Design a protein with these regions (language model features):
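Loop-to-transmembrane-helix entry motif
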Residues: 106-107, 243, 279, 317-321
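Extracellular/periplasmic helix-loop-helix junctions in multi-pass membrane proteins
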Residues: 303-320
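Extracellular loop-to-transmembrane helix junctions
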Residues: 1-9, 246-253, 315-331
């Protein structure tokens, strides 16, 4: 995001992935090599979003099963994907301010309400104590758990660590471009605080509150979680079941999951639309609709084609498109360093 924002707003280049490679390949950024970079970014984004949409459909279907006893089948999950995609299409047609911003604000309010509820109703002191412990443990184990040297949990490493890295990387073109698009006029310091520090702290708080509450229930042998997680998509709702107003909070949880994936789909469609339009922000509406529809179709195809191993199909898709894009990210980091050093020399020379 910082690399894209720098080369777009400071150097006057189009808001697209290829612009970050200008220090390396100069005018060839607008040739076949630049096209290849953007194609890889589009593939990573669309499969990353489709993977997320598939997981979201599984969790939402699990919530519907939990609340209303609606069977958690592939057909239910496909129906959820169709509904999410339809709302996302309406949102992308309305644009950034009319659709994406409104849904994002709704999502943020619901998330704050649910988080505050879990902290207040749950064991607040235990949660905040766990916040300090888990933060320290995270920093202590960040490097050891980031590589495979000396590890005995190969299955976990490949099924979780590698998968989530690949999944996050596949999101990077979409998230990076979207953040760059809304960050015009910010300083690098403001950017780092808003994009790195604040989300990290909020994520740690969220994971500590929900994960800590679930672990407390397991240790106290309370509820279904104490018997082990038989279905990952039900874990959130099984934890909320042991708190007051379980029906209301579970319903909010389902809505939160759905709205989150709607905002991901519509904002991702806008980003893909911008990439394929050469950085233009006002591409034709039918093009936006096409990309939003493609995300839903790919997510549905992965779930339907994966059958009983739908989760494995989603993971394979994320890893396949995410890992190659790692090279692009590393190159963008180097390009940003080169661009900032050039800017520093320019400022110093201008001062003289």
């Amino acid at each position: 995001a910082l690399s894209l924002a720098f080369f777009t707003y400071n150097k006057g280049l189009p808001l697209t992935i290829r612009s970050a490679f200008f220090p390396f390949i100069k005018d060839r950024s607008w040739g076949w090599f630049g096209h290849l970079i953007d194609v890889v970014a589009v593939l990573a984004t669309i499969f990353g979003l489709a993977t997320s949409l598939g997981f979201g459909a599984q969790q939402a279907a699990g919530g519907l099963k939990f609340l209303f006893d609606i069977p958690n089948t592939i057909n239910t999950q496909i129906a959820i994907i169709i509904g999410v995609t339809a709302v996302a299409i309406v949102s992308v047609v309305r644009g950034l301010d009319g659709g994406v911003k409104v849904l994002s604000n709704i999502n943020m309010v619901l998330a704050v309400i649910l988080l505050a509820f879990v902290i207040i109703v749950g064991q607040g002191l235990t949660i905040f104590s766990g916040l300090l412990n888990t933060s320290g443990a995270y920093l202590e184990n960040l490097i050891p758990l980031s590589n495979w040297i000396g590890r005995e949990d190969d299955k976990f490493f490949h099924g979780w660590t590698v998968f989530y890295w690949a999944w996050w990387i596949s999101w990077s073109p979409f998230v990076g471009m979207f953040i760059a698009r809304v960050s015009k006029g910010r300083t690098v310091r403001e950017f780092i605080i808003a994009v790195l520090l604040v989300p990290t702290l909020v994520t740690i708080l969220w994971m500590t509150a929900f994960g800590g509450s679930g672990l407390d229930q397991v240790k106290a042998d309370v509820g279904q979680l104490a018997n082990g997680i038989s279905d990952v998509s039900l874990a959130l709702f099984q934890m909320l079941e042991n708190l007051p107003m379980a029906t209301v909070t579970s319903f909010i949880g389902i809505v939160l999951v759905l709205v989150f994936f709607v905002t991901s789909s519509d904002s991702g469609s806008l980003v893909i639309d911008s990439i394929t339009a050469g950085g233009k922000l006002d591409a034709p509406v039918p093009q936006r609709i096409f990309w939003a529809t493609m995300e839903g179709l790919i997510a549905g195809a992965l779930l339907f084609g994966g059958g009983a191993d739908a989760l494995g199909a989603l993971q394979a898709a994320a890893i396949t498109v995410g890992l190659p894009f790692t090279l692009v990210l590393l190159a963008m980091c180097i390009a940003l360093y080169m661009g900032l050093k050039h800017e520093e020399r320019f400022v110093l020379n201008s001062g003289k």
